[in-house]
């Protein structure tokens, strides 16, 4: 210890002589006197000279960036109560106080280290000072601890010490760094490296001491202790737990060994380097403390830096003050420029493999007990923080995050599962200062999202229920409407879809009756049907949905628009009306392409006075045309002609009538006849299982032309037609006759027939009566039909013999066995 004091005098005086202020009465003692003082200090167990060294460097000139107020304070610097008579003791304890007083000192010019090796050589002969390299600092701390039982002079005058900020010199900074190094090894070449490693630490202390100089006492501790303490992760600020303060007691072992787990938590690569290179450990620690200070979120951690220069101060005293520093306000000044700090220390070797995932997971698991954010708040990638070149501008970003340290600890364990995928995707992206808050907010937002999902499910269920209810109501309403429409269709004999033909306006109030529509003057009425109505009335519908007949004189009608509407919907019926009498001409014309525009008078709507009479005459046709497309108009015409032919009285004409039916089925296979419902009443099974190709043309086809004239005169005999239909039904039921009724040939009853008693299935015949043979039942009887349309069996013996030609024509007729 005394070596540094004796050896550093020339340099110290040289450094202080260039300053405008110098301590009065301070002269460099001789080497013998220094040794004597050293022995006195060790033998008497004098208290640490940390505070007593304040008058040594109290008058040094502040650096270029020092405040001008420092020049006014040198007169307060000497502290006689704490000075030891010897010269070595003040020098030995100068470093901690000078560092704590001078936060503005710039150590960038700390280069006069040449006298230090000579001092080391002198100390080789002192066995009292020399200790094993592994325990030098530890023993030194123990010696300092033995000196501390007395009153601690450091915190006694806190105000004067805070005012003596410019009292730190370059040589003092150098001595504070070299003393622990000299005790570890006697090699000289290591001094420049320690000097460079110390510069950033001193600059950090300069920027940090300003925040704590007002309320925090002088810090005491070895630089190695601070390095070991701060060697923790450069990306993760070290834990500030009361346990750490307890470890800093005077009886604690070497600080580097105690705080080694902190380094392994922050950076596995640095911990490996610490184990492999014990020679360079102090350089690494000096560099890592500066990185740790830059990356810390709480500026209260920075006041620990002055303890690095207090070689003779116990570690426990510096830790006792740590609790007071944590509550300090953030620092207000950035670090000095790089030109003042000097060149950075050499960069240590990088570990071969660096994997921070397990540390991130461990940090996320322990984040509940930490008040700091998990990783670096400066958002630096992993490699750059190890390089000191990027260190000076970084402290400027610290004041931008002052509120973060004041936040209470947050319990962010629930979102651990959410953080792992983020770490997996962003391995090189460190967690930012607001990462914890964002994750918590994300968790809250996700919780809200889940609540929204639950509520949305409930809303969906409600919507589904409402939708079901609405659909059920719609179905009920639809069923009611359909039921009502069916009743209306049945009541008013409506066929096909209901179409609005015309819109009319009521010209007077009408009070309807049973089937009549009631409406008021000016009300709009939709005309649904203008045919198949009672004379002078149309079928209308009001806006309320009521149906009924209206008088044509009670509404205002635009006949021009009605004609155009009628022509667009149905242009064929008027031509049929004109050619009603010429049935076959009409059919032939319909057989043509059926179009030609239907222009001219044939497509014009008839005048109102004759509308009722004309449409009543052809109401069956209009019904069909209103509900059937124009494609079926040809079939309509054919059915109309067939119906007229069915009204003949003559049985021979009836047989001729069957041929057009067959030809119609041949020409229009697959097409449905709209008016067939009127014909099916005659015999629904007429067209069942019938193929026109199975039967040869009837021999009576030649007489078709002869029946045309009579068909016209007999077409208006509905009673005869109904009777014929009834007889055909009896035939099918009584004789189990299937298929089309076809006449095989005609014959007459023998004139020699005598009246006899007929059976239930026998046809009552008269002598000379003409009969139509429908079926050859067997060799004794045949199925015949008389002129009245009745059917029955007739014995062949009662019929006139036609020379056996009859049997040739019927071929396989015997297959019909109706017995």
Swiss-Prot record:
Transmembrane segments: none annotated. GO terms for cellular component: anchoring junction; cytosol; nucleus; plasma membrane; protein-containing complex. Residues 499-560, 736-804 form the SH3 domain. Residues 448-495 form a coiled coil. The modification N6-acetyllysine is found at residue 3. Disruption phenotype: Slight defects in platelet function. It holds the Pfam family hSH3. Acts as an adapter protein of the FYN and LCP2 signaling cascades in T-cells. May play a role in linking T-cell signaling to remodeling of the actin cytoskeleton. Modulates the expression of IL2. Involved in platelet activation. Prevents the degradation of SKAP1 and SKAP2. May be involved in high affinity immunoglobulin epsilon receptor signaling in mast cells. PANTHER family: FYN-BINDING PROTEIN 1, SH2 CONTAINING ADAPTOR PRAM-1 RELATED. This is FYN-binding protein 1. It comes from Mus musculus.
């Amino acid at each position: 210890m005394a070596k540094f004091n004796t050896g550093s005098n020339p340099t110290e005086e040289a450094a202080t002589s260039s300053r405008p202020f110098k301590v009065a009465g301070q002269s460099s003692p001789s080497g013998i006197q220094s040794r004597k003082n050293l022995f006195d200090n060790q033998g008497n167990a004098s208290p640490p000279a940390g505070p007593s060294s304040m008058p040594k460097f109290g008058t040094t000139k502040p650096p270029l960036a020092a405040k001008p107020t420092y020049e006014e304070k040198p007169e307060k610097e000497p502290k006689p109560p704490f000075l030891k008579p010897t010269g070595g003791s003040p020098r030995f304890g100068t470093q901690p106080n000078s560092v704590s007083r001078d936060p503005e000192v710039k150590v960038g010019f700390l280069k006069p280290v040449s006298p230090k090796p000579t001092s080391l050589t002198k100390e080789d002969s002192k066995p009292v000072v020399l200790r094993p390299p592994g325990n030098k600092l530890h023993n030194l701390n123990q010696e300092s601890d033995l000196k501390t039982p007395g009153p601690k002079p450091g915190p006694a005058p806190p105000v004067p010490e805070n005012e003596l900020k410019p009292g730190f010199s370059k040589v003092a900074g150098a001595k504070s760094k070299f003393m622990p190094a000299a005790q570890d090894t006697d090699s000289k070449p290591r001094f420049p490296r320690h000097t460079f490693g110390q510069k950033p630490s001193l600059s950090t202390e300069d920027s940090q001491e300003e925040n704590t100089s007002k309320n925090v006492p002088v810090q005491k501790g070895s630089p190695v202790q601070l390095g070991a303490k701060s060697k923790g992760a450069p990306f993760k600020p070290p834990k500030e737990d009361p346990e750490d303060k307890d470890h800093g007691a005077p009886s604690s072992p070497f600080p580097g060994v105690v705080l080694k787990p902190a380094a392994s938590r922050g950076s596995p690569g640095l911990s490996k380097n610490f184990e492999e290179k014990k020679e360079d450990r102090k350089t690494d620690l000096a560099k890592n403390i500066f990185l740790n200070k830059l990356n810390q979120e709480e500026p209260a951690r920075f006041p620990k830096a002055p303890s690095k220069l207090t070689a003779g101060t116990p570690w426990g005293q510096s830790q006792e003050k740590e609790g007071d520093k944590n509550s300090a306000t953030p620092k207000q000044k950035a670090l000095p420029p790089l030109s003042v700090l000097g060149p950075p220390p050499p960069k240590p070797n990088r570990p071969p493999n660096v994997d921070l995932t397990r540390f991130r997971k461990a940090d996320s698991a322990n984040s509940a007990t930490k008040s700091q954010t998990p990783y670096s708040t400066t958002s630096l990638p992993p490699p750059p923080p190890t390089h000191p070149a990027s260190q000076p501008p970084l402290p400027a970003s610290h004041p931008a995050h002052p509120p973060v340290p004041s936040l209470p600890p947050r319990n962010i364990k629930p979102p651990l599962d959410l953080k792992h995928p983020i770490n997996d995707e962003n391995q090189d992206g460190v967690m930012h200062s607001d990462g914890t808050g964002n994750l918590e907010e994300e968790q809250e937002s996700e919780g809200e999202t889940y609540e929204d999902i639950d509520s949305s499910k409930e809303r969906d269920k409600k919507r589904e229920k409402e939708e079901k209810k609405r659909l059920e109501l719609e179905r009920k309403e639809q069923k009611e409407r359909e039921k009502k429409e069916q009743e209306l269709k049945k009541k008013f004999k409506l066929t096909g879809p209901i179409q609005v033909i015309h819109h009319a306006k009521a010209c007077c109030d009408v009070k309807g009756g049973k089937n009549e529509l009631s409406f008021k003057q000016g009300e709009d009425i939709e005309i649904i049907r203008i045919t198949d109505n009672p004379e002078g009335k149309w079928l209308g519908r009001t806006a309320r949905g009521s149906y009924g007949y209206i008088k044509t004189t009670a509404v205002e009608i635009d006949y021009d628009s009605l004609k155009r509407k009628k022509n667009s919907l149905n242009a064929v019926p008027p031509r049929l009306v004109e050619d009603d009498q010429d049935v076959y001409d009409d059919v032939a014309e319909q057989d043509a392409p059926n179009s030609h525009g239907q222009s001219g008078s044939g497509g014009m709507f008839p005048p109102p006075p004759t509308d009722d009479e004309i449409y009543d005459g052809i109401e069956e046709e209009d019904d069909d045309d209103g509900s059937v497309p124009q494609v079926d108009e040809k079939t309509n015409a054919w059915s109309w002609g067939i119906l007229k032919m069915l009204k003949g009285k003559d049985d021979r004409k009836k047989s001729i009538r069957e041929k057009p039916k067959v030809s119609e089925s041949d020409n229009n296979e697959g097409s449905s006849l709209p008016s067939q419902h009127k014909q099916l009443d005659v015999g629904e099974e007429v067209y069942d299982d019938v193929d026109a190709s199975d039967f040869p043309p009837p021999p009576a086809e030649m007489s078709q032309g002869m029946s045309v004239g009579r068909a016209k005169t007999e077409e208006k005999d509905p009673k005869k037609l109904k009777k014929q239909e009834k007889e055909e039904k009896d035939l099918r039921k009584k004789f189990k006759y299937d298929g089309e009724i076809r006449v095989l040939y005609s014959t007459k009853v023998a004139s020699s027939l005598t009246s006899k008693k007929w059976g239930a299935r026998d046809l009552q015949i008269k002598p000379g009566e003409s009969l139509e043979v429908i079926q050859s039942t067997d060799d004794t009887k045949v199925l015949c039909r008389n002129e009245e349309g009745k059917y029955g069996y007739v014995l062949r013996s009662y019929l006139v013999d036609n020379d056996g030609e009859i049997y040739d024509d019927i071929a396989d007729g015997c297959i019909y066995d109706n017995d």
